[in-house]
Amino acid sequence: MKAVVLHEYGGPEKLKFEDNVPEPQISGTTVLIAATAASVNPIDWKLRSGMRQKDSPLSFPAILGRDVSGIVRAVGANVKHFKAGDRVLAFSNATYAELVAVDDSSVTCRMAWTWPTRLRSR
């Protein structure tokens, strides 16, 4: 799988695109999400730079990221509310990757939404 991987603390140049990262495994209450989008948050650069090293040390190699949007690829045997093909949002770790394994308690359905007519640009 492809992912953005960090091998040591430092600036953005320390983030590396890698093609052969092992895919996360699922079990029990885990949902496997094929990521379509991931956010970049202030905590990501704080972790990457080592600024949060005392209270949140990283184990290298590390995949950063906290939020993901995507499509469920597979679910663990005890997952009751999601199925393959569902569009979801999740809060997790290691979201700068093609696939993200998340406990189902941190996943929610992504609702279809369009701009109300009066807000659409003309």
Each model region followed by its residue ranges:
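Short N-terminal binding/cap micro-motifs at the start of the first secondary-structure element
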Residues: 10-16, 42-43
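Glycine-rich beta-strand-centered segment in the early N-terminal region that forms part
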Residues: 22-39, 52-94, 101
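NAD(P)H dinucleotide-binding glycine-rich loop of Rossmann-like/cofactor-binding domains
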Residues: 90-122
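Extreme N-terminal starter segment of soluble prokaryotic enzymes
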Residues: 1-2
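Well-ordered beta-strand positions in beta-sheet-rich domains
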Residues: 17-20, 99
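Conserved hydrophobic "DFG−1" position in protein kinase catalytic cores
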Residues: 5, 23, 47, 101-102
